[in-house]
Amino acid sequence: MVLVEYLWMVIVGFIIAFILAFSVGANDVANSFGTAVGSGVVTLRQACILASIFETTGSVLLGAKVGETIRKGIIDVNLYNNTVDLLMAGEVSAMVGSAVWQLIASFLRLPISGTHCIVGATIGFSLVAIGTHGVQWMQLVKIVASWFISPLLSGLMSGALFLMIKFFILKKEDPVPNGLKALPVFYAATIGINVFSILYTGAPLLGLESFPVWATALLSIGIAIIFALIVWFFVCPWMKKKIASRLKKEGALSRISEESLDKIQDEETSVFKELPGAKGNDESALPLTSSSTDAAVASDSVSNGNTRVPYGRAASMTNGSIRSPISNGTFNFDGHTVKSDVHVYHTVHKDSGLYKDLLHNIHLDRVKTDRPAPENNYRVLRRNNSYTCYTAAICGVPVHSTFKSSDVAMPEDSEKLVGDTVSYSKKRVRYDSYSSYCNAVAEAEIEAEEGGVEMKLATDLADPNPPQDDSLEEDKEEKDKSEVHLLFHFLQILTACFGSFAHGGNDVSNAIGPLVALWLIYEQGGVMQEASTPVWLLLYGGVGICAGLWVWGRRVIQTMGKDLTPITPSSGFTIELASAFTVVVASNIGLPISTTHCKVGSVVAVGWIRSRKAVDWRLFRNIFLAWFVTVPVAGLFSAGVMAILQYGILPYV
């Protein structure tokens, strides 16, 4: 018996179900491909394409069985035998509450559990409709337990696996031999665990719903062994050749780079400018020179601590010499008289070779020269050439002015970098190149006439004995070696695809489970929902998930793959494999588990092991708080909509 009078509710339900599927795609799909995008093995576009294929396939093949729990496992549907309209309104309310909270979480870049969201929303409408006796409260107890069990168990599993990989492969001077030996094991484990997960879930369309557990385990082990043999005899030799070819190319590029640098240094034209105060007269001049020997001498003078030569404005250049109008070694800058005892070197560069060599020498001088760092204020110059980032990285080249007056305003975008007594600012700053700094100082001397400022370079003010920073060693571990990257590259893509397939089967029920219930109630005229889930509804949910992924999925993918902690192919593979194994084991022994919580726990655990300072604990705190409020917030949204439908709309329809 078709309930024609409630057709409007079915139409509204289909619209809201698509929005709910959209929100699931925007948030939950990051579980599968967030780490793969973060490690760089796939681009965001490639991840969206792969996820669209595997999410849709998984939702169609695996989604029917999981949807049964969402439809019947949270509330007692028998209590709605005489109030079918209330149950239909409740399913609509559940979809609204779940969709709203997941969209809010996606906007905030917080990964939350779609399962917990729909469970909370279902409990919310049931409390409004028939009170507390219609809720399966043990489901809620399991959800609360999963907040702690999921990340802890998955984190321990991921941490143990990553420590093994780190000890036996990553820490080795040559990681290739051990990596190739472990490759068949990794592939076998990946294939075996994910095949077991798919078979254990059961796919009604494939006739796997009645497969016994022992047969599932035996078949999974057999498939894993077959893949291990294929990898050992075919993939490993190919991978060995590929790694050797990559290392050979890198070595050749390194030699070419060194030869090019030597050639560039021989061809470089050096220009030494007459600096005010060097000889004490207006006619002091220094001829231009183009010899590579002079360039080398000038470069050496920077690094060996020889006499510093002041630099000023070049008013004219005659017969190959640069003439300076200033004789007393001072010039005006920003309304202050500047004592120009600054050492500078200005090179006209055809390429970056000599320039980089000079900056390295400055860096060495900065470390070796024993000078106390005075109190400093800072002036940031404009950015006008391509060497900015390199300069800042090597020697921190902003101009430092020792203003004695405290009323000099600091630029908004300035950043303090040099000296133990100087506080550090986190604001973004743009630095100029070394040669452009020289030009800017020269131009500044004609801007004013009086004052009292002494100009210093960052290289002269640096602490001669900089403290050793342990983070430097940790930064070296942020990226895998090229050969390690190749070893784990395809493995991580494989685990992400399997995870996406399983996720599509599991989480499509979160999106269209209430819609399936709504449709079956409308079609059959009763609450028991005896028919199986229509395939076209599963496909409808899969399309909605893909739409959400393409439009908004990048937000939570960035949180999972980049913001929480840096990800590499080796750590990403560990996270994917360990979290998948945790979900399979915990589900089989009856422990409450959440895929999202497992993935976040693995990301944090592996990130903490790789680098103590790499984990964004503030972000993790926010994610955990989002988990904590997911059930009550989704329930409140759902309860509000249910109250409107039950008391404001249904009595008048």
From Swiss-Prot:
CC annotations in GO: apical plasma membrane; brush border membrane; plasma membrane
Annotated catalysed reactions: 2 Na(+)(out) + phosphate(out) = 2 Na(+)(in) + phosphate(in)
Family annotation (Pfam families): PHO4
GO biological process, one term: phosphate ion transport
Superkingdom of the source species: Eukaryota
Residues with attached carbohydrate: N81
Keywords per UniProt: Cell membrane, Glycoprotein, Ion transport, Membrane, Phosphate transport, Receptor, Sodium, Sodium transport, Symport, Transmembrane, Transmembrane helix, Transport
Transmembrane parts of this sequence: 2-22, 47-67, 87-107, 110-130, 143-163, 188-208, 218-238, 484-504, 533-553, 573-587, 595-610, 623-643
Alphabetized GO MF terms: sodium:phosphate symporter activity
Lipid bilayer topology: Multi-pass membrane protein
Ranges of the Extracellular topological domain: 1, 68-86, 131-142, 209-217, 505-532, 588-594, 644-653
Cytoplasmic domain ranges by topology: 23-46, 108-109, 164-187, 239-483, 554-572, 611-622
Subcellular location: Cell membrane; Apical cell membrane
Database matches in InterPro entries: Phos_transporter
Function in brief: Sodium-phosphate symporter which preferentially transports the monovalent form of phosphate with a stoichiometry of two sodium ions per phosphate ion.
Subunit structure: Homodimer.
Protein family: Belongs to the inorganic phosphate transporter (PiT) (TC 2.A.20) family.
Name the record gives this protein: Sodium-dependent phosphate transporter 2
